[in-house]
Structure formats: structure tokens, C-alpha cells
Amino acid sequence: MAPFPEEVDVFTAPHWRMKQLVGLYCDKLSKTNFSNNNDFRALLQSLYATFKEFKMHEQIENEYIIGLLQQRSQTIYNVHSDNKLSEMLSLFEKGLKNVKNEYEQLNYAKQLKERLEAFTKDFLPHMKEEEEVFQPMLMEYFTYEELKDIKKKVIAQHCSQKDTAELLRGLSLWNQAEERQKFFKYSVDEKSDKEAEVSEQSTGITHLPPEVMVSIFSYLNPQELCRCSQVSTKWSQLAKTGSLWKHLYPVHWARGDWYSGPAAELDTEPDEEWVKSRRDESRAFQEWDEDADIDESEESGEESIAISIAQMEKRLLHGLIHNVLPYVGTSVKTLVLAYSSAVSSKMVRQILELCPNLEHLDLTQTDISDSAFDSWSWLGCCQSLRHLDLSGCEKITDVALEKISRALGILTTHESGLLKTSTSKVTSTTWKNKDITMQSFKQSACLHDVTNKDIGEEVDNEHPWTKPISSDDFTSPYVWMLDAEDLADIEDAVEWRHRNVESLCVMETASNFSCPSSACYSKDIVGLRTSVCWQQHCASPAFAYCGHSYCCTGTALRTMSALPESSALCRKAPRTRLLREKDLIYSGSEKSDQETGRVLLFLSLSGCYQITDHGLRVLTLGGGLPYLEHLNLSGCLTVTGAGLQDLVSACPSLNDEYFYYCDNINGPHADTASGCQNLQCGFRACCRSGE
């Protein structure tokens, strides 16, 4: 019978595990053939893993037991300052790196046995002292309920750290296991043949169909999948099935939480204490010098735990990027890196490049910058994205929003329902209305054949996304030559471009007028796109006229129920046809069955104080954000009411209840929007911080 009630005995259970490990390494030490290099290295690797667990055990005791006891008793100090764990780990590392031959192995073995014997003589009495001396003191200074809570935390920490370490080993050994399986393939096949001769009737789990195995694997968490991948080549391939890796939560996994379901069940804002803990981890990790020999005597237990967790998180992220995502990246739908201590812009960039079909991306309170989105370099490369949370990402600027807007793609209806502006720069002559040639007219009112002999050099693919284009460089786009007496109202015409109409709406712009707004594309856009991405996903009609009354001054809007005969318009020979039907100018009733871009439902830029009106207006390109319901711009200090209005006008589904922006801005929906969420917030930008 234990001397203390089991539910409050904080030492016995963890110490049982430590004593078990001591027995295991003593047994291995006695059985190892130090003349054999494989046996020698296997022992050192096993010892290294064992002593890492010893060190983690001591750190947990420091933080959750001894640290609390020191707060209530002044007689406790330097309990773990005399241990030799770091020295032993250094000894194992030197053996693995420096010992090269049998002679050195035998000399090293002598030193190893002496050091292990000395450590064991100190370590076992050390644990006995904790059980016989410190447990009674805990009973004296803590209540029964407090001790129950302490024990629960101690056991949970031991389990989570052990599970995380096993996951990391699984990730790193994934490819190594495959190589070993290939090496033993023939011997295994030979053995299987012999077993089949003995009992042809027997059926094991290895004979189950792949679809059944994948169904079984779907009940496993990431750690268990990594273990299964090491069983055989077949299991390794099945463990890389994309459907098993749809939802990734590396930050949670590094802390022992193996949830891998849809993100909707995790959409809860953490309390400020939890956020502070994650920020402390991040700061400790950044300050930590990887080359330093950190010992419990040099670092507080709390700081050591924080560094260890951040290190695990970093290794786990590297494991995912190099060993998992190259195989399953296209199937990943959810990536949650919120409050990560170790993630970098480079890591995010690599992950986004490997996961083109993301629907849910959460980078809340991470230290990323605009470069994290460099992999979103072509139009529509992540057009399935529905949820994007960049709350607290203070380094994000308009540059990132330009890349994000480009990645969201272009609405099919937006692309097909607008005028096609010219995409080439005129070098020597200007285009005239008389140059227009019609070759055929269909019900969809397509302008089939338009070109110009004086086409200049190609414009850079990203140009329309990065800066406004001055109309001084080129002239008006092609327009229909219609009866000037039948003019339509300008505001009616603005509505027409958002819906299908039977008659044809035509806009003739004043050639020398340029809207001063950086996000207004009422001006012409140069450059017929020749790259594959542009030809597949968009063309100039995506950049709609802004609809501002003041920028449309001098514009003649006309309607007509039928198109004139080509002879009425043509004065020159027919020109060469454009390459693709998709690039033609038309306005009609054609609609796509399903939108494939700009389906964003949730966008949070809370605390991204470097965002300006330009960044907001970039989001209105390509058809705006027609499905957006939740928009959080709390703490975006430099945006104005005009910029907000431009964005909101491109978000017809926006719910005022989930629309947040600074209370000091006189913006849209001022009476019904929810205001700023960052008031007196300790960890996100706000104009009233400190009040």
C-alpha cells in the first residue's frame, strides 16, 4: 500500500516510468556488442531518447511541483541544479558523431559504462528523496484538491510530451521506413510465400482491400498514422492517402491535442491568458541560442518548457513540409497555425505552395510578413479559399492583399459579362472607331474579330494588380458605333453590368480621362495576356468600371435591341481573329453553372494596422467578394470611410452584425455595424490601446 493516497501522490507514477527506463538501458548496456557498429549506434540512439525523456521529466517537475512548493516554502531551492542530464546527452551526441571504428567504440564503451553507473547511483536516490521528503511537504502546504489538480497536470504533461515526441519520430522516419521496406522486400515476399503454403485459408489484416484499410485509417489521429506508415510499404502508401490529411493543426499537435476534424468546431477566441502563454513561448524561443547548453540550473522550468514546446512545433512543421505535404498537399482543406511560436513566412510560403485547394487558413497572431504569400503568384491559384484569418499579423501590408486578391481568382459571371478592354499598348498610331471590324453577330452579342497591327510589347502579367494605369499612355477601347440620340441613364447602366439583359449595353469612354482613385479601373487596361495562367483564368474584362459618377463624366451609354449589319460599321478588311473564344468581347445571358473563384466567406484583418485604402480596393477587383459575410477590420488605423465604402459596395452579402471597424472612422453602415473589437485589447493594435 502506498504511504499516501494515490490520487494525491504526484511522484510515484512518473517515477515508475523513469525507473522502468533505467532498467531498460541497464539491460541493453549489458547485452550490447560494442564491436558491432550497428549495435553500438542503436544503443546510443536509445540512450539519447531515454535521457531526453529524463530531462523533460525533470522540467515538468520543476514547473508543476517544485516551483509551486518553493512559492510556499523558503527552504526549497536548487533541487535539480546538480543533475548531469545535459552532460550525458552531450556524451551520447559525441559518440554518435565522432566514434568511427571498432577501437574507438571499445574505448568509448568503457567511459560510457562508468558514466552511466555514476548517473544511475545519483538518479535513483534523487527520485527516492522526492518521494520521501517532498511528498510529505506537499501534503503539508497544499490542500487535497490542489494536489489532485497538480497530479492531473503532471500526468497530462508527461503523456503529451511523450506522444508529441513519437509523432516527430514518425514524421522523420516516414521515408526511412520506406527505404528499409524496399531493402527487405524480397525476403518478406519469400517468407509470405512460405506462410501461404502452410495455410492458404488464413486471412490477416494485410489482405484487406485498400479502400477498407483507408476507412480504418480514417479513425486514426496523425500520430497513429505515422506509426502505421512504418509497418510496410503498402501501409506507408495508404497512410499518404489525401483524404486522411484534410485538416492540419500543427500547433495543437505539438501540445498533445490530436484533433484533426473540420475547423468549425474550433472557432473559439482564446482568453488573454492563453494568448500570453503562447507569446511567452514565442519570445523564449526567439531568444534561445541553439548552440547553448541549457540546463535546469541555468533556465527556469517554465522557460525551458516553453522552449521545448516551440522546438517540437518547429520540427513538426518541418516534418509536415518535407515528408507529408508533398504527397497529400492537394487534398488539404484546413490549415490552422494560429498563435504558432515557431512558424515563419518561409514555412507558410512552402505550405501554401503545396496546398492549392485550401478552404480554411488561420494565421492568427503569427509573425509572418507579406512574403508568406509569395507562392500565390498566379491568378486563381487558391480560388477555393473561404476562410482567411490574419488577426494580429502586424507585418501584413497592402502587398499581401494584392497577392490574396489575385489568388482568389475572378468570378466567372464577372469575366463573361463585362466589356473586353484592349490588352495591347499602341506604339505609333492610335485606335480609331472606324478600325472596328465585325465578322459575325450572334445572340450573345460577341465582338469576334478585333485586332490592331500596331501592337507593342507585352505588359507584365502582374501589372493591373499592382498599380493603376494612366490613360495617357493609350486611347479608348473599341466600342459599338450606335445612334447618339438613344442615350441611356448612367446609373441604369451601372446596374446593367451586374445582371443579364436582353439588349446590349455599351460604354464609350472619354479617351483622356483617368479616375484618380487607385482602385478604379474605369480607365483602359493594356496588354493582351499571353501567359498560360492569364489565358486560362482571366482577361481584362475582369477589371470593371468603378461606377463612380465623377469618373464616368464624358461617358456615353447607349442601348440597342439589335446589332447593325457588319457593313454599316466596317470600313476596312476583316482583321485576324483572337486566339480564344473566351477572350472575345460580349454581353449576353451566358452564365456558369457554379462560381469557381472569389468564394471567400470570412476575412479578418484585425490588428493589421499597416493596411490602407489601396489594400481594401484591391479586394474589389475581379468581381469583389460577393459571398463575404464576416469582415473584421478592427485596428486598421489608416483606412478611411471612402476605402471602406468601396470595399463594402463589392460585398453584397456582408452581414452588418459581423462587420467590424474602428469607431473613429465615419464609414458605411455606421448605425448597424458592430464597431471595433480591439478596444483595450492587450495584444492587438487599436487606436485606443492603453485607455
Curated annotation (Swiss-Prot):
PTM annotation, UniProt: Polybiquitinated upon iron and oxygen depletion, leading to its degradation by the proteasome. Ubiquitination is regulated by the hemerythrin-like region that acts as an oxygen and iron sensor. Undergoes constitutive ubiquitin-dependent degradation at the steady state by HERC2.
Binding site for Fe(3+) 2: 58, 61, 80, 126, 130
Domain (F-box): residue spans on this chain: 202-248
Classification via Gene3D superfamilies: 1.20.1280.50, nmb1532 protein domain like, Ribonuclease Inhibitor
Regulation: An iron-sulfur cluster promotes IRP2 polyubiquitination and degradation in response to both iron and oxygen concentrations.
Keyword Iron: yes
Co-factor requirement: [2Fe-2S] cluster
Keyword annotations from UniProtKB, A to Z: Cytoplasm, Iron, Iron-sulfur, Leucine-rich repeat, Metal-binding, Nucleus, Repeat, Ubl conjugation, Ubl conjugation pathway
Functional pathway: Protein modification; protein ubiquitination
Subcellular location: Cytoplasm, Perinuclear region; Nucleus
LRR repeat start-end pairs: 340-364, 365-392, 393-418, 479-508, 576-607, 608-635, 636-661
Residues binding Fe(3+) 1: 15, 57, 61, 130
InterPro entries for this protein: F-box-like_dom_sf, F-box_dom, Hemerythrin-like, Hr_FBXL5, Leu-rich_rpt, Leu-rich_rpt_Cys-con_subtyp, LRR_dom_sf
Location of region: Hemerythrin-like: 1-159
CDD domains associated with the record: F-box_FBXL5, Hr_FBXL5
A GO biological process held by the record: SCF-dependent proteasomal ubiquitin-dependent protein catabolic process
Principal subcellular localisation of the protein: cytoplasm
Superkingdom as given in the UniProt entry: Eukaryota
Alphabetized GO MF terms: iron ion binding; iron-sulfur cluster binding
Oligomer status and interactors: Part of a SCF (SKP1-cullin-F-box) protein ligase complex. Interacts with ACO1/IRP1, IREB2/IRP2; the interaction depends on the [2Fe-2S] cluster. Interacts with DCTN1/p150-glued.
Protein task: Component of some SCF (SKP1-cullin-F-box) protein ligase complex that plays a central role in iron homeostasis by promoting the ubiquitination and subsequent degradation of IREB2/IRP2. The C-terminal domain of FBXL5 contains a redox-sensitive [2Fe-2S] cluster that, upon oxidation, promotes binding to IRP2 to effect its oxygen-dependent degradation.
Domain remark in the UniProt entry: The hemerythrin-like region acts as an oxygen and iron sensor by binding oxygen through a diiron metal-center. In absence of oxygen and iron, the protein is ubiquitinated and degraded.
Protein name listed in UniProt: F-box/LRR-repeat protein 5
